[in-house]
Amino acid sequence: MMKTLAFIRRPLSHMPGLAAACILTVLLSGCQSIDTEGLVASNAPPEISGPAASAIAGDMVSRLAEQIGPGKATVALKVDTSPFGQALEAALKGWGYAVVTDQKTDSGMTIVTLAYVIISFDGQVLARLSTNSVELGRAYTVTSTGATATSALSLMRRG
């Protein structure tokens, strides 16, 4: 471990301390991800309008379908009472997924556990969908009549 740190520290010694610390933090944080067993908590702020929630949910579910296949599995989803939670459930059903919200399913079914998080940040909304095998994220600009993607899709696959 010490040899590895010395190897990293040597090239960074020519940079100012703050830049070196930032680079090292980014490198080390790339090794972390959320626990895949804890994908049942979902959260979205209630102040996102229905049309904006529908636009975000529709876009994110279409991207999820590209990764796991359209309508090929039952999705286990713990929905909150926000407009986004309801819009996400409707979008999943629109893409042909069976949705269970009580976390109880038949033992022979293929289940995809799905969690979502919506965070307001700096005038935008950050949306994230997480499953045991893939995590999708994207930023949106929200208006009262809808939402527009303002970033590329972030995709992380798990082994």
Swiss-Prot record:
Leader sequence residues: 1-21
Coiled coil region boundaries: none
Membrane topology: Lipid-anchor
Primary location: membrane
UniProt keywords, alphabetically: Cell membrane, Conjugation, Lipoprotein, Membrane, Palmitate, Plasmid, Signal
UniProt entry tagged with the keyword Signal: yes
Lipidation (N-palmitoyl cysteine): 22
S-diacylglycerol cysteine: lipidated positions: 22
Subcellular location: Cell membrane
GO cellular component, one term: plasma membrane
Entry protein name: Conjugal transfer protein TrbH
Source organism of this protein record: Rhizobium radiobacter (Agrobacterium tumefaciens)
